[in-house]
């Protein structure tokens, strides 16, 4: 048992997810909002983006791609259906400086999705589970593709193709 636990810890130290994404949900347009549900939504999206393995590459914690996702909820159409907008930004450090350079800055005002409180956000690149996870996966692959393009010509192409699925 100790050997298994040690192996698990060592394997986790060598493998890290690709994104270090901050997530914010703005629901100020919703009258009498269920704050716990929106906090659960924010946490679920945060875990989905930051804990999913989007590539087969190994990332150290300090190599993770910095990004921000802001979802503004304009309408709650039903208990589990929402419409609003999403803003996605990513940046990367400039070599041998203390500065970051903006890589991606997108605003989409046509976001519509369903979310059930405490429901796990699942992803399989060959299946469609929900509009929310598909949109988030699209932007995750776009962020990764843009970041890989900063290292080599067409380096992000495989991730742009995954985003198109």
Where are these regions (language model features)?
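Start-of-domain marker
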Residues: 17-83, 94-96
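Alpha-helix initiation and N-capping motif
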Residues: 2-3, 137
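Acidic/His-rich structured neighborhood in mature extracellular/periplasmic domains
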Residues: 83-165
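Sec-dependent N-terminal signal peptides
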Residues: 3-13
């Amino acid at each position: 048992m100790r050997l298994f636990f040690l192996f698990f810890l060592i394997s986790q130290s060598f493998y890290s997810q690709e994104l270090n994404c901050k997530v914010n949900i703005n629901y100020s347009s919703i009258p009498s909002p269920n704050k716990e549900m929106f906090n659960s939504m924010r946490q679920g999206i945060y875990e989905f983006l930051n804990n999913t393995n989007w590539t087969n590459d190994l990332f150290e914690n300090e190599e993770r791609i910095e990004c921000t996702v802001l979802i503004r909820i304009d309408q709650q159409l039903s208990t589990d259906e929402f419409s609003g907008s999403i803003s996605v930004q990513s940046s990367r450090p400039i070599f041998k400086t203390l500065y970051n350079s903006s890589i991606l800055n997108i605003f989409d005002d046509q976001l519509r999705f369903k979310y059930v409180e405490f429901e796990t956000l699942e992803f399989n690149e060959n299946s469609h589970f929900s509009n929310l996870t598909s949109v988030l996966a699209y932007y995750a692959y776009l962020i990764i593709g843009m970041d890989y393009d900063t290292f080599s010509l067409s380096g992000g192409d495989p991730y742009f193709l995954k985003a198109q699925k």
